[in-house]
A protein has these predicted regions:
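Bacterial N-terminal signal peptides that target proteins for export
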Residues: 1-7
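Hydrophobic helical h-region of N-terminal Sec-dependent signal peptides
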Residues: 11-12
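C-terminal motif of bacterial Sec signal peptides marking the signal peptidase cleavage site
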Residues: 15-18
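N-terminal active-site segment of His-dependent metallophosphoesterases
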Residues: 20-103
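Active-site-proximal loop/helix segment associated with metal-binding centers of metalloenzymes
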Residues: 26-34, 47-50, 173-194, 242
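Extended active-site neighborhood of metal-dependent phosphoesterases/phosphodiesterases
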Residues: 36, 98-185, 203-216, 230-265
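Active-site neighborhood of phospho(di)ester-bond hydrolases with catalytic His/Asp-centered motifs
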Residues: 59-61, 85-91, 115-121, 187-191, ...
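Surface-exposed cleft-lining segments at the edges of enzyme active sites
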Residues: 92, 156-163, 193-197
Length: 268
């Protein structure tokens, strides 16, 4: 049967209108807007901090589901003019849903200063890791601010059923020597700290030995447990500072100087 020519315009209008009614699957990794966010912001961090002898940065994490609190965090931090960058310790999503990553990216993009986001364990659910890689980049990455190297790691071993080397010791070993002439201090950041159940604790002590090979290791940062935590985990002088979740409306501010470092907790 031939389709009547007079009905073509009506059919075309219905087809176009129907396109707006298509509901994408929540795990479709259909990305709109900025991608490779960490790389773009790292370039800005390194440029802004070049030749600086004092670095001041914020750590926070676990903004999953707390959108209003995260938006308030951004507004609060934007009132300051003394922070160089932000490290988000991971878990921007609760269920690994694509839109969760996009919503959190758009909130964080309101910051007046650059930021990076680590991969959290909730970010690995469903197609979350794939979405994270598209929007933010590789889960293992590093950058240099002033003469401080920041090594950011995927430590979510349990989410991969131990099928991958997590933490990635090859990456760590390479980072010790990579651009070694450009830094003399180091900060290691992760979502899950050693001795948490989700960390690969079979290699916890090996992990600590590796990171202590970095020049001038200052301290480590983490998130994940939804409360603030400070402890010399291995009793070797290296402190671990764990950020609270955004629900509790606080974050860390670290200042690294030629003589050492200071930390404070800011509330909003």
């Amino acid at each position: 049967m031939k389709f009547p020519k007079l009905l073509y315009p009506s059919f075309l209008c219905l087809l176009i209108a129907g396109c707006d009614m298509i509901d994408y699957h929540p795990y479709d990794v259909h990305i709109s807007g900025e991608t490779d966010v960490n790389a773009h912001n790292i370039a800005q961090i390194e440029q802004n901090c070049q030749n600086k002898t004092t670095i001041r940065f914020v750590t926070m994490g676990d903004s999953q589901r707390w959108y209003d609190e995260t938006d308030d965090f951004v507004s609060h931090l934007n009132k300051r003019d003394d922070i160089d960058f932000v490290i988000h310790g991971g878990d921007v999503s609760d269920f690994g849903v694509t839109d969760e990553f996009l919503w959190q990216r758009d909130i964080m993009n309101k910051l007046k200063i650059p930021y990076v986001i680590l991969l959290g364990n909730h970010d690995c659910l469903g197609t979350g890791e794939e979405t994270y890689r598209v929007i933010f980049g590789d889960p293992n990455f590093s950058f240099i601010a002033g003469r401080v190297k920041f090594v950011c790691l995927n430590t979510n071993a349990i989410e991969f059923d131990y099928s991958r080397p997590i933490p990635d010791f090859e990456f760590l070993a390479a980072q010790i020597r990579d651009h070694e002439e450009e830094f003399d201090k180091t900060v290691v950041s992760m979502h899950i700290r050693p001795f948490c159940n989700e960390f690969n604790n079979n290699v916890a002590h090996v992990f600590q030995r590796y990171i202590k090979e970095f020049p001038g290791l200052q301290f480590c940062t983490s998130a994940h447990e939804h409360h603030r935590f400070e402890k010399d985990l291995f009793e070797d002088g290296i402190m671990y500072y764990m950020s609270d979740c955004m629900k509790n409306r606080n974050y860390y501010i670290f200042t690294i100087t030629p003589d050492g470092y200071e930390r404070e907790v800011a509330y909003y």
